[in-house]
Amino acid sequence: MGIPVGKSMLVLLISLAFALCCIAAYGPGETLCGGELVDTLQFVCSDRGFYFSRPSSRANRRSRGIVEECCFRSCDLALLETYCATPAKSERDVSTSQAVLPDDFPRYPVGKFFQYDTWRQSAGRLRRGLPALLRARRGRMLAKELKEFREAKRHRPLIVLPPKDPAHGGASSEMSSNHQ
């Protein structure tokens, strides 16, 4: 007795699916640009935050940032992980260090190296897809002038009436009503 056709077809389909998964895993990665790149970094790095260039490679001028690597070349999870920020201290370290300090010890606010509000505005521009021209100062001025021009054009009357009645040679409307 041989193998039934249904089972052999099922085995063939499963092996084909497995082969395709393996090929896709070794194939080229996905390219990410703009808002997709920012959203993916937020997802991968979660509460740790991330850098657009690796902090350890700032001295090396030839190193590429994440935009050059992920937008123009393929990008994978391992590469994205390298741009995640490392937290300064874990929660355990912070809680034990505060317990050691006396209660009357002054606590000064810690400065941030990464301004979240500035990043959020930049990320919002990336998501909205504003062109680079509008992000530049001159571009904003040109956009403002264009907006003012469009507003003035929109509020212009459709028909401009002449100040004098052309049929009666400049006679006023009172005289024309008396004349009838």
From Swiss-Prot:
Keywords for this protein: Carbohydrate metabolism, Cleavage on pair of basic residues, Disulfide bond, Glucose metabolism, Growth factor, Hormone, Mitogen, Osteogenesis, Secreted, Signal
SUPFAM superfamilies xref list: Insulin-like
Region spans: Disordered: 157-180
Stretches the record annotates as B: 25-52
Subcellular location: Secreted
Transmembrane segments: none
Function: The insulin-like growth factors possess growth-promoting activity. Major fetal growth hormone in mammals. Plays a key role in regulating fetoplacental development. IGF2 is influenced by placental lactogen. Also involved in tissue differentiation. In adults, involved in glucose metabolism in adipose tissue, skeletal muscle and liver. Acts as a ligand for integrin which is required for IGF2 signaling. Positively regulates myogenic transcription factor MYOD1 function by facilitating the recruitment of transcriptional coactivators, thereby controlling muscle terminal differentiation. Preptin undergoes glucose-mediated co-secretion with insulin, and acts as a physiological amplifier of glucose-mediated insulin secretion. Exhibits osteogenic properties by increasing osteoblast mitogenic activity through phosphoactivation of MAPK1 and MAPK3.
Presence of the UniProt keyword Disulfide bond in the record: yes
Annotated site, Important for interaction with integrin, chain positions: R48, R58, R61, R62
Domain of life, source organism: Eukaryota
Species, as recorded: Mus musculus
Tissue specificity: Expressed in the heart, blood serum, kidney and skeletal muscle including the tibialis anterior muscle.
Name the record gives this protein: Insulin-like growth factor 2
Any single biological process term in GO: positive regulation of skeletal muscle tissue growth
